[in-house]
Amino acid sequence: MKAKKYLWSIICVYFCYLTHGIQAIILSQNNVNFAKQWGFNMADPQSAAYAAGLAAVSTAVAWTGFGKFVSVWIGGEISDHVGRKKLMIGGAALYILCFLGFLFTKNALVASVCGFASGVATSGFWDASGYPAVQEAYPAAPGSALIGIKFFVSVSGMIYPFLVVHNASSGNWKLNVIIPLVMSIVCLVLAIIAPFAYDDQKKASEGTDGKSKDAVQAEIDAAKAAMLTKPGKFVVFLVMFYAF
């Protein structure tokens, strides 16, 4: 029953990570085109300008990783304090801004800032709220619910490179940025309309007192404890499979 009630939150998280799968590889998959957009001469692969263009893209990728690194430590604490919905919305909004930046900027520095922000959006916002959200929405099998995140990241990581080749060969490489931009807007809409189990429990806890408040808090603690349940062998196998 709980899984049905919070089905939209599960769909929201999975779609967000389908989008994240593209964000994770968008710079490397479109490196030459991005370098051209940022003002580098990419006509001769043997030239210093070509190498500088690729280095600029690599720098933006590195800033994405740095954004993940600096935000991963505090995202969980913030998520527990303000709830899952706000961080899912914030992450989607940041993704929209980042993809807009990638689409229009002609400056490598601005692109690096966008890369950093997308890293923060992923680890500081979505990882901190999305991972626990799917487990709380499906407490009967939290480990299995979590596997869906890895699955959708892998799906977009497999499909997106084919889109890159197709769009680039047809002269429409910017579609490679427009597609995840539109997906990010869908993520924002889903995050706004979806109910989240933790948020509902938190509101109920804040709106009651005495024994009722204790009961709601006990339900929240039980949901957190369920997420620490040792996964089955099949779940462990899938995690190892997608990790390597």
Regions from the language model: what does each represent?
Residues C114-F151:
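Cytoplasmic helix-loop-helix junction between adjacent transmembrane helices
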Residues V70-K106:
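Conserved MFS/SLC helix-loop-helix module at the cytosolic interface between two early adjacent transmembrane helices
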Residues I25, T64-W73, M158:
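Residue-level signature of mid-helix packing/kink "hotspots" within the transmembrane helices
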Residues F104-C114:
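Helix-loop junctions at membrane interfaces in 12-TM secondary transporters
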Residues A141, G148-D199:
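Helix-loop-helix hairpin linking two adjacent transmembrane segments in secondary transporters
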Residues W8-M42:
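Extracytoplasmic
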Residues P195-A225:
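Flexible cytoplasmic inter-helical loops of multi-pass small-molecule transporters
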Residues T64, L94-F99, M183-C187:
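MFS 12-TM fold signature
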